[in-house]
Amino acid sequence: MSISSSNVTSGFIDIATKDEIEKYMYGGKTSTAYFVRETRKATWFTQVPVSLTRANGSANFGSEWSASISRAGDYLLYTWLRVRIPSVTLLSTNQFGANGRIRWCRNFMHNLIRECSITFNDLVAARFDHYHLDFWAAFTTPASKAVGYDNMIGNVSALIQPQPVPVAPATVSLPEADLNLPLPFFFSRDSGVALPTAALPYNEMRINFQFHDWQRLLILDNIAAVASQTVVPVVGATSDIATAPVLHHGTVWGNYAIVSNEERRRMGCSVRDILVEQVQTAPRHVWNPTTNDAPNYDIRFSHAIKALFFAVRNTTFSNQPSNYTTASPVITSTTVILEPSTGAFDPIHHTTLIYENTNRLNHMGSDYFSLVNPWYHAPTIPGLTGFHEYSYSLAFNEIDPMGSTNYGKLTNISIVPTASPAAKVGAAGTGPAGSGQNFPQTFEFIVTALNNNIIRISGGALGFPVL
């Protein structure tokens, strides 16, 4: 039996190996001593979450609603939307009878949002939609937080798995739930670009929401259908559900930093420019691989583009919006297979990006946009099928400029997404039974961009020195 041993004396042998390469890497006046830590002091502050209680409109399905940003704190660090979704009971009189199953769509909190924006005296400083929320979550949510994020936005079995007519003692099919959506505005990315609310006394600051109708979010399935039969539930005492769902307790929360009196006095003393991020969404296009498997779409963006995000969305069923594959979900009596293994593939085979009459990217495979580019330039690689990104930045999630291209200076910008064989099968509806492709699928092409811009804080108001 051997006995493990080691002693300090052997370490001096390592120290004695210092030569020319080591002289290049170690020593000198600017070298770091790893065993004597220097404390980097910070200004004195505290932080506190605050509910933004001043609101206009109704925080309900299909409505517009806005919350006023309070100036009670000095800096707004981040915000999130919190809502309570109601319980839903599938009636025994539903159109599919015992074969009826009800569920909410995947990414409920994403798809609740038609558009969200932040305004300063009606000047829109930033906006995003549910497409960007899908892209942003796919490429930036680390694996260690993915389960928690899914819980926040409603991706839990009790809400998105098919539920039958309740059997006593149960009284509801889908339970009531409190859900949260982190709002990915520019000031939430880093405390160094926090919104200086105390320095903006002359701005009426609002976070504005346009919510989708519940019909886009609630799904009634027929588990006995040969081809998936998904419909919007009908409201009525002897129909599918007794009453239309209503949101409750819609609230925007903000996390504020409160600083010292000295720092607060300095906030409004000089002009301050802040590099921020904005989101742009190009008009959506119908994508039909049976008539044109390589369509050419114009994309018109402006400012310094850090990254492009694009996908082909499966639009076969309007109330299943977060589906970017070649197949519809397959429903069984107890579960929904969101990405059936025999049918759910990437609709795009390869993509060409063109501008200035030059192929910037020529016939690049989807594996590059879904795997290789995110591996090097994004915080994470999507776990779901169908997401693509191209980053001009070394790391598009970094606040500091690390690469971009000014699309406002380019002409004739277009993108050509070429259909995969699976997309053609899906569009024709010739897939095998249980594949989600055994009936015709419809699609649309979506492309969004992340860009940099500059905001200026001056004279107690916010503006854009470069529009």
From Swiss-Prot:
Checking InterPro entries in the record gives: Capsid_N (IPR031654), MCP_C (IPR007542), MCP_C_sf (IPR038519), VP_dsDNA_II (IPR016112)
Q: Name one Pfam family in it.
A: Capsid_N
A single MF term (Gene Ontology): structural molecule activity
Q: Which GO terms describe its cellular component?
A: T=147 icosahedral capsid
| Classification via SUPFAM superfamilies | Group II dsDNA viruses VP
In its keyword annotation, does this UniProt entry include Lyase?
Answer: no
> Which Gene3D superfamilies does the annotation name?
Adenovirus Type 2 Hexon, domain 4 (2.70.9.10), Major capsid protein Vp54 (2.70.9.20)
Which keywords does the record carry? Answer: Capsid protein, Late protein, T=147 icosahedral capsid protein, Virion
The question of whether Nucleotide-binding is a record keyword is answered with no
Localization, per the record, is:
Virion
Indicate the family of this protein: Belongs to the NCLDV major capsid protein family.
Q: What does this protein do?
A: Major capsid protein that self assembles to form an icosahedral capsid with a T=147 symmetry. Represents around 50% of the total virion protein mass.
Q: How does it assemble?
A: Homotrimer.
State the protein's name: Major capsid protein
Question: Which organism is this entry from?
Answer: Invertebrate iridescent virus 6
